């Protein structure tokens, strides 16, 4: 097995069964690098990245669109300090911009230049949902991945995902993927691909990288209600380390991506990963996380279990569970993150809440008894500015 940047204190896992590489169980998510005056603070960002690499991290995740390209440029700058051949770089293709075959080439070559690399180690189709998956197929992204792998400019091919489990299965089965990237955390382990997707992909030999381990920062502590923060303190449980350990306690993920923006966050996470292993989560930690998880479930605006029973009855194809997940997350983090609105905008017109014709056919299929048409009006108002 190949291993880069080995350090005894870091823990490593194989990326699936196809790659033959060992990846640090903690990876750097380069979407939330240190900022100053609305732009990435390059000096602090490079120092942060080098602190992680010095601790044995060998996986950095970025994307074409992060910080309007500045994230990739800063990662390239950090790697120029002697790290280029010691670290795996993952970046992503903006699939939503792919209108026809060949559209992949310009952004890909821009990424090579930004990252100062001749080959991308881990390359992903970015944010696949139903709409973006269709664009990927129509623009022949899979064939393009094959060609670039043959040329040696992409080593491993994967995708990141934001939709439901059934589509996730379809995508996993459609291509010989080396790895994938999913949202996964203790607060909502069933959302999107979820635990089922984690096990499904892993069972196929596909490596699974985990993003959003802290639910967009919500699980880090400050955004939790006071009683939850007090509970963590009284039980001697760290909200961040326990959330990470919850994921590392499971054998399937090969890396957990943390969007660290401060050096102390990096140092804390490096300390936590030293003891990461399957089954490492203590019963004390588990009991606290279960209570916090219960609170989140009870206080999300829409008590949707994402069972999907409503979907077949919809005459226009509104993606009800996906919409409710986006709405819940957006409000739980008090509208502080741009990802839910961006994902909403990327959906097909007939999938959006505004496509609902208010026929009510879905209501009789909902085990939770939700007023689905009423909630869809609220989702429309939230993401499209139309009155409910």
Put a short name on every predicted segment.
Residues 23, 60, 86-87, 117-120, ...:
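Local beta-strand N-terminus motif with an aromatic residue
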Residues 59-66, 155-159, 181-182, 255-257:
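Short catalytic-loop micro-motif centered on adjacent basic/acidic residues
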Residues 51, 55, 74-82, 114, ...:
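Alpha-helical structural signal in soluble globular domains
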Residues 66, 82-101, 126:
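Structural motif corresponding to the early beta-alpha repeats
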Residues 36, 96-214, 226-227, 234-235, ...:
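Glycine/proline-rich, positively charged
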Residues 15, 51-53, 58, 196-388:
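Structured C-terminal cap/extension of enzyme domains
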Residues 11, 44-48, 71-78, 107-111, ...:
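A general structural detector for well-ordered alpha-helical segments in enzyme core domains, enriched
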Residues 1-87, 150:
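N-terminal binding-site loop/beta-alpha segment at the start of enzyme catalytic domains
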């Amino acid at each position: 097995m190949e291993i880069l940047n080995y350090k005894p204190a870091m823990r490593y896992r194989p990326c699936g069964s196809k790659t033959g590489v060992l990846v640090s169980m903690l990876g750097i998510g380069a979407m939330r690098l240190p900022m100053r005056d609305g732009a990435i603070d390059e000096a602090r960002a490079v120092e942060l990245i080098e602190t992680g690499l010095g601790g044995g991290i060998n996986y950095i995740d970025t994307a074409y669109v992060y910080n309007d390209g500045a994230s990739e440029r800063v990662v390239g700058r950090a790697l120029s300090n002697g790290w280029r051949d010691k670290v795996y770089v993952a970046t992503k293709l903006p699939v939503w911009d792919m209108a026809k075959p060949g559209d992949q080439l310009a952004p890909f070559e821009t990424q090579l230049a930004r990252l100062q690399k001749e080959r991308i180690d881990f390359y992903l189709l970015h944010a696949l949902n139903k709409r973006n998956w269709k664009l990927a197929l129509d623009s022949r992204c899979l064939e393009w991945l094959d060609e670039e792998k043959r040329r040696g400019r992409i080593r491993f091919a994967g995708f990141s995902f934001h939709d439901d489990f059934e589509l996730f299965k379809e995508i996993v089965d459609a291509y010989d993927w080396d790895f994938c990237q999913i949202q996964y955390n203790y607060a909502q382990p069933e959302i999107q691909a979820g635990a089922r997707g984690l096990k499904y992909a892993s069972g196929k030999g596909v490596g699974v990288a985990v993003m959003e381990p802290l639910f967009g920062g919500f699980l880090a502590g400050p955004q939790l209600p006071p009683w939850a923060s007090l509970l963590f303190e009284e039980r001697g449980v760290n909200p961040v380390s326990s959330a990470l350990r919850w994921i590392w306690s499971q054998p399937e993920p090969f890396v957990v991506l943390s969007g660290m923006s401060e050096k102390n966050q990096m140092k804390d996470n490096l300390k936590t990963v030293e003891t990461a292993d399957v089954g490492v989560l203590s019963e004390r930690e588990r009991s606290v996380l279960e209570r916090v998880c219960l609170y989140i479930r009870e206080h999300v605006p829409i008590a949707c279990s994402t069972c999907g029973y409503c979907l077949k009855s919809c005459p226009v194809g509104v993606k009800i569970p996906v919409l409710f997940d986006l709405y819940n997350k957006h409000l739980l983090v008090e509208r502080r993150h741009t990802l839910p609105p961006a994902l909403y905008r990327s959906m097909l017109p007939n999938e959006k809440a505004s496509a609902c014709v208010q026929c009510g056919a879905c209501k009789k299929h909902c085990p939770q008894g939700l007023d689905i048409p009423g909630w869809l009006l609220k989702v429309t108002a939230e993401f499209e500015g139309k009155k409910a």
